[in-house]
Amino acid sequence: MKGSTVHTKWQAYCRLMRIDKPIGSLLLLWPTLWALWLAGRGIPEAKILVVFVLGVFFMRAAGCVVNDYADRHIDSFVKRTASRPLPSGTISEKESKILFVVLILLSFGLVLTLNSMTIWLSLAALALAWIYPFMKRVTHLPQVVLGAAFGWSIPMGFAAVSESLPLVCWLLLLANICWTVAYDTQYAMVDRDDDLRIGVKSTAILFGQHDKLIIGLLQLATLLLMVAIGWLMNLGGAFYWSILLAGALFTHQQKMIAQREREPCFRAFLNNNYVGLVLFLGILISYW
């Protein structure tokens, strides 16, 4: 195989795993770090931290691969996704399946270094990662499944650090689901016209003209759940300041999506990286 061909293929694999678009990994990373710090009431064990950070990137890559495989026959009809490696033919279906298996094996190899409770919970993570891409064909609520998939590192983190699943763990998972549905609805607003044309379901379509209101309510629910978590965990003032900053970011996002235009909606989605970061810094400083 010629060097240029190898380079082209490697670039295609990177695009399939979204290495060139780290936003998804970051949105998966922040809740993971929230959970690890809350479960350990401070900096977690180094080995556990490394396992989860690597696991985030491997599982996010695996999720992107299976998502593109599931959407391979419809992505060519959507402007934003038509040039992806599978619909464009740069990578074959067989190659994508092999890559998915490799990424899952790498992820599971990491989990095997943790306790048995975490290993069992990881099976649910695999199931959620596999079924999510197919949900948009059967329900208008695929974003809820995505929220569970993106948040499943939370119970896994608590299990790995404390071998327990306290109330705070489930409140944090619920907060993450609310947040995920909010930001992924913003993301779905970008593709709403294309999705309506090809019959793909999403919360952006389900919510219709009430989309901005429901996103706002989900963002409010996220903040209120975070307040409850801060109270239960006796977190310091820095955490509550971080909640206020997250609220300001949510308000800014509402302004961006006000006209429901594609580019501002996508920027609002990207802005959620700062929400996750700010909340993590609030937790981090509280345990300093």
Curated annotation (Swiss-Prot):
It is a multi-pass membrane protein. Pathway: Cofactor biosynthesis; ubiquinone biosynthesis. One of its GO terms (biological process) is ubiquinone biosynthetic process. Pfam families: UbiA. Keywords: Cell inner membrane, Cell membrane, Magnesium, Membrane, Transferase, Transmembrane, Transmembrane helix, Ubiquinone biosynthesis. GO terms for molecular function: 4-hydroxybenzoate polyprenyltransferase activity. Catalyzes the prenylation of para-hydroxybenzoate (PHB) with an all-trans polyprenyl group. Mediates the second step in the final reaction sequence of ubiquinone-8 (UQ-8) biosynthesis, which is the condensation of the polyisoprenoid side chain with PHB, generating the first membrane-bound Q intermediate 3-octaprenyl-4-hydroxybenzoate. This is 4-hydroxybenzoate octaprenyltransferase. The gene is ubiA.
